[in-house]
């Protein structure tokens, strides 16, 4: 059973909160992101080498900024976590925004502390449309947790927080502006499929070529039909096609990397 938390106003002491954000060339997104969390007790930014105005914009909101070469999604978020000074952590990405409703719930949580971690739905926008189907919503993410109870244990390029203890659900959404153009989407998915393929190879996963087209077709069918992506109109079709292509490249690239590795090992 999912436990739902309701917010109420109360003027009582609360624990302090550190917001952690990792960045790379996010000048288009970062200001709105920071505005949505400027009420926090501390904002931590770990940048992996931005060449645009990301750092300059961040300095308007916090001086807790570090530069660290990109080690992977989960490791970079661990770096940010280690810099946080307060007992509660809220991790968000540069293209995400804390809604006013979510803010109220978070402040209530910092007063009651009736769990060790909290998940909430993510309201994803794809090409400027709120995607309500195709697996895009409610897309619960666990981003608020006690520092001493949470750790990152995901497989790049996707982060995952594991909390030791009780986890509850907040109904208010985190707003996520994913991609504003198809060019941006294709570029990002190419990078994601590279990282996913490399992770599969590191894990020693065996990729059977005959299964790749089946996985690709299933991803489209699952996204567009099973999860009713068609209800989001042409946006839903584009998203389902994109998901299937990303699945194809993820496994095809993994197969290619494994093939090259085995070929190198068999050279005289």
Task: List PLM regions with ranges.
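Short, acidic, metal-binding catalytic loop of nucleotide-sugar glycosyltransferases
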Residues: 35-41
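Catalytic-site signature of metal-activated, phosphate-bearing donor transferases
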Residues: 78-82, 87-92, 99-261, 267-268
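Acidic helix N-cap motif at the loop->helix transition within catalytic regions
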Residues: 29-31, 52-61, 101-102
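Conserved beta-strand positions in the Rossmann-like core of class I SAM-dependent methyltransferases
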Residues: 44
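N-proximal low-complexity "stem/linker" segments adjacent to membrane-targeting elements
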Residues: 1-35
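Residue-level detector of structured alpha->beta connecting loops
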Residues: 41, 62-63, 85, 114
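A conserved acidic beta->alpha catalytic loop
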Residues: 36, 47-56, 93
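Conserved donor nucleotide-binding strand/loop of the catalytic core
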Residues: 55-83
